[in-house]
Amino acid sequence: MADNDGAVSNGIIVEQTSNKGPLNAVKKPPSKDRHSKVDGRGRRIRMPIICAARVFQLTRELGHKSDGQTIEWLLRQAEPSIIAATGTGTTPASFSTASLSTSSPFTLGKRVVRAEEGESGGGGGGGLTVGHTMGTSLMGGGGSGGFWAVPARPDFGQVWSFATGAPPEMVFAQQQQPATLFVRHQQQQQASAAAAAAMGEASAARVGNYLPGHHLNLLASLSGGANGSGRREDDHEPR
């Protein structure tokens, strides 16, 4: 005694319901956040279309896996200029990235001090460290003025700024100039003395060649004339 809508049992109507509704969707557990917690996460950066196209092109040319890796590479390349302009890096300390294949003396947010720079700049204070070649050529002259340098960029080149005072190269030139003039003066004096000695020897040779012959000819003529006059007197004397 039952129908599709319900059944009667001991005077009690029991309703039968069918579970034909849609199955409840299984919710996935929240995935673990694998990104670093940084300020501004979730924000979108707007850039000109030319810049975006250039980023995409660099991603293909450099063989990066994502555009974010290319932007990170660009930040690494521009980090020296960023440090020179702001004094510190622009990336938070909590930012962690995978190391790239490109070697660079700078890392995001921090500057790597090389061994050569650490040795040469150990007692120089907190200024910018210069390499051995440039440091010795500039510091060896004893110039009184200090200087600072901005790291080089391909589009701007190296920028140097010297404080008041002549550069050491000019000091070297001024110190070497009197010595050079003295050496040249000595050489000129030696050359003039040698020329005067040569002229004296030549004139003495000329005098020795001409004067003795002239005197000999004169003596010969006089002696010849005296002998002739004596013979003539002998001829006129009667015998």
UniProtKB/Swiss-Prot annotation:
UniProtKB keywords: Biological rhythms, DNA-binding, Nucleus, Transcription, Transcription regulation
Gene Ontology biological-process entries: negative regulation of DNA-binding transcription factor activity; positive regulation of circadian rhythm; regulation of circadian rhythm; regulation of DNA-templated transcription; rhythmic process
Subcellular location: Nucleus
One Gene Ontology term, aspect cellular component: nucleus
Domain TCP residues, every copy: 31-85
Keyword S-adenosyl-L-methionine: no
Any one GO molecular function term: DNA-binding transcription factor activity
Region Disordered, annotated ranges: 1-39
Family annotation (InterPro entries): TF_TCP_subgr (IPR017887), Transcription_factor_TCP (IPR005333)
Tissue/organ expression: Expressed in leaves, roots, and stems.
KW Membrane (keyword) present: no
Biased composition (Basic and acidic residues): 30-39
Domain of life (superkingdom): Eukaryota
Free-text disruption phenotype from the record: No effect on the period length or phase of the circadian clock.
Main localisation: nucleus
Subunit organization: Interacts (via N-terminus) with APRR1/TOC1. Interacts with SPL.
Function: Transcription factor involved in the regulation of the circadian clock. Acts as a repressor of CCA1 by binding to its promoter. No binding to the LHY promoter.
Protein name, entry field: Transcription factor TCP21
Native source species: Arabidopsis thaliana (Mouse-ear cress)
Gene: TCP21
